[in-house]
Amino acid sequence: MVGDGCSRILLLTADIGEGHNTAARAIAERVDQLWPGTEVRTLDIITMMAPGMSRLTRSTYRLTLDHAPVIYQCFYDALWRHRWFARLSKRVVAAWCGWRLWPRLRRFQPEVVVSTHPFGAAAMDQLRRVHRLALPTATFVTDFAPHPFWVFSEIDAHFVMHEVSAPDTRRLSARGMVCVAAPPISRMFRPRDQGEARDSLGLRASAFVVLVTGGAWGVGSLEPAIAALLNLGDRVQVIAVCGRNQDLLQRLEALGAPRSRLVPLGFVDIMPELMASADVVVTNAGGVTSLEAFASARPVLLVDPIAGHGKANAAMMEQAGLAVVCPGIRELRSTVAELVADQGRLAKMRAAELAHLQGRDLCDDLALLATAEPLPLPPGGGMRQAIRTLTAA
C-alpha cells in the first residue's frame, strides 16, 4: 500500500476507437495525483486475446457501422431482448479474456483492477468465479447508456456517468456498488475562456463555431452534416475533426472552402482548445467525446447517432437534459439555426452541464474504491472449478 491508497493498480482498456484509452489515461493521471509512487500498468484486453485480434475487431466493427449498421443494431437489441443470448455471449467472452488475463494478473499482483472496456469487466468477473480472487475491481461505464456487456455481477463497483444510467445498471444484475462518478477524462477539459481559445487557434471571434467530430475514426454522417451547416450562412464557422479518416479529410480539403467557414483537421491533440472555442459540439456516438464536451460546458448535438449503443446513448443523454438528438441532417440544420438566434437557450444548456458535474471529482471516486471491501466471493463451482484452480496455481 502507498499511504491509504494502492501500490499497484491494473487498468484494462481496449484500442477500439479512442474513448476507452482516454478514460484509462485519465484514471492513471488521477492515481498519480492521489498516490504518488503507485505503479500503474495498462493492458489492452482485446490485443491480449490473440495476435491480430485488436486489428480484426476494429476493422469488423468499423465496416459494420459504415456499411451494415442494421447488423450491429440487431446484435445490440438481442442482448436486451434475449437473456440467454446475452448470458451466453458474456460467458464466452469472459472465459476467453479471463484465461488470457490470469497469468499476467499473477505476475503483476495488483491491489485494485479498473476496467474501461466491457471485456475487462468480463475477464475479472470470470477470475472472481474461477480463481476466487478477493481484490477490489471496478468498471467505469463510459457509455451513457449501460448495456448488458458492461455489467457483471462479480464487479465490486460500476461507476456510471449520470443518475439516469444507474437504474439500468442495477437491473442488469450489478450486485456491487453503482455510483454516479465524475467522467474519466483529462483535467484539460474544463470551462475556459472562449475568446482566448479562438485567438490561439486563429478562429473568428464573432463566428458561431460548430465543432463536428466522429471520434478517432471519423465515422458517421459527417459530410452531409458539414454541408448543411455551411449552408446556414457566413456567421457559422465549422471545425471538422476527421480523426484517422484521411479520405474524409482529403475530401473536405478539396472543397476549397475558406478557413473563415471550414477548418478541416485530422487526428488532433488539441481537442480541449477546440472544445473551448466552440459554441456547440456535433457528434454521433455519445461516448467520451460527449463527456469531454459536458466538462467543457459546451452543448452537444447528436446527429444521426450510430447504431446500437450510439442510439441508446443519445436517447439517455437527451433524457438527462444534457444533449439534443437530431435524427437527421434537416433537424441538425434547424437546431443550429435556432441556437444561432437564441443565445439564451445556449446558456441554459451550458448551465445544465455545469450543474451535472458540480462537486464531482474522479479522485474521490478512486479513493472510494481503494477503501472499499470486495464483494463476498461467489459460491464454489464444484470439482471442475477446483481442479482448474489447483492446476493453474
Predicted segments, located by residue:
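Conserved N-terminal ligand/cofactor-binding loop architecture of enzyme catalytic domains
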Residues: A26, R30-R104
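Active-site and donor-binding regions of nucleotide-sugar-utilizing enzymes
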Residues: Q73-L172, V180
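A nucleotide-sugar donor-handling region in carbohydrate enzymes
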Residues: D156-V209, T213-A216, R244-N245
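Donor-nucleotide binding loops and adjacent catalytic segments primarily
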Residues: G195-E196, L203-S277
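Acidic donor-binding loop of glycosyltransferase active sites
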Residues: A276-A285
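A short alpha->beta transition loop at the rim of the catalytic pocket in nucleotide-sugar-dependent
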Residues: A278-D279, A297-P299
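C-terminal "capping" alpha-helix adjacent to the active site of nucleotide-linked donor transferases
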Residues: Q319-A320, G328-G344
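C-terminal amphipathic helix plus adjacent low-complexity
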Residues: Q343-A393
